[in-house]
Design a protein with these regions (language model features):
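Signature of Gram-negative outer-membrane beta-barrel scaffolds
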Residues: 1-68, 79-81, 86, 163
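Residue-level signature of outer-membrane beta-barrel architecture
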Residues: 16-19, 52, 61-63, 93, ...
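Repeated loop/turn-to-beta-strand initiation elements of outer-membrane beta-barrel proteins
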Residues: 22-25, 67-70, 109-113, 157-160, ...
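Transmembrane beta-barrel strands of outer-membrane/channel proteins
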Residues: 27-31, 70-76, 114-118, 162-166, ...
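Membrane-embedded beta-barrel scaffold of Gram-negative outer-membrane proteins
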Residues: 63, 70-71, 93-153, 159-173
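Gram-negative outer-membrane beta-barrel transporters
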Residues: 118, 137-221, 253-256, 278-282
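C-terminal beta-signal and adjacent terminal beta-strands/loops
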Residues: 214-221, 237-283
């Protein structure tokens, strides 16, 4: 009932420079423009929107000892949005900025990284609380947090990987004053993934894998939360000269959990125990 046509075009340039002892700098610019037209056959209205923006990014890395470095980066984003509100106005593009700083280590089979970030997004389209089936732009959202990752290759064919994310979110500007200061819906504050592989010494072609996924409590709205959950996965793979066969199972113990929700009373159950088989051929 409301077909939309969106056209975008962009051009960008980027440069990386190494200088001094262990320093690397990266910078770039991107120009993007968009044209959107939507015809609402129900309300007999049309809207055309032209948008353009120049975004930039910059980063610097310093390797202060072999395999160990620190870095900082800044980036901007520009994302055209399809659709229009109840009054027939086309949506403005979503824009954002992100700061990130951290450290990375990679040496002798060990890798690790730690990073802090601060992300802000503006002109976010969300469900219209008054007119069902429509969306409105709600202002600004902010996400700050910490990300940790590590991997290690040990003796006897063992390999471990792990990742943890702490994310604090909030609505910083909104057309609905009650939303300001509230966390974003369906964004867990804590998330953890751990995975291990074991290549059998007696059968090097055979690899066993197992891991755990944890997702913390998620804010639905002022009325409810989705509870935290933990699920376990496992796999077995056989590798030949130029192919690999893998069989896996997700949610090994068939735990019931909720992965998301549309609104109060309409939640999405997580996937029950499920199996998959993949075959990869290497050229």
């Amino acid at each position: 009932d409301a077909p939309t046509r969106l056209r975008t075009a962009a051009i960008y340039m980027q440069d990386q420079i190494k200088f001094g002892q262990g320093w690397t700098a990266l910078a770039g610019l991107r120009y993007e423009k968009s044209r959107q037209r939507q015809d609402d056959h129900v309300k007999n209205t049309s809207a055309t929107q032209h948008d353009s923006d120049v975004t930039g990014m910059a980063g610097i890395v310093y390797e202060f000892t072999p395999g160990w470095s620190v870095y900082a980066s800044y980036s901007q984003s520009f994302l055209p949005q399809m659709g229009q509100d109840y009054h027939g106005n086309a949506f403005k593009p979503e824009t954002g900025t992100q700061w990130e700083a951290g450290t990375k280590y990679a040496r002798d089979g060990w890798t690790a990284s730690a990073a802090v970030f601060d992300l802000r997004k503006r002109n976010i389209a969300a469900a219209d609380p008054v007119n069902d089936g429509y969306k409105v732009l709600v202002g600004e959202q902010r996400a700050r947090g910490l990300e940790l990752e590590a991997a290690a290759e040990l003796k006897n064919g063992l390999k471990f990987t792990g990742a943890y994310a702490y994310t604090k979110t909030e609505v910083t500007r909104s057309t609905n004053a009650r939303e300001i200061g509230q966390p974003l819906n369906y964004t867990p504050r804590h998330a953890l993934t751990v995975w291990s592989n074991w290549r059998l010494p007696q059968m090097p072609a055979l690899t066993l894998g197992a891991g755990v996924r944890y997702v913390g409590k998620q804010h639905g709205n002022s009325a409810f939360y989705l509870p935290a959950y933990t699920v376990m996965d496992a796999s077995v793979s056989y590798t030949h000269t130029n192919w690999r066969l893998t069989a896996g199972v997700k949610n090994l113990f068939n735990r019931s959990y909720y992965a998301g929700a549309v609104r109060t009373g309409v939640v999405s159950p997580g996937m029950p125990r499920n199996f998959n088989v993949t075959l990869k051929y290497f050229f």
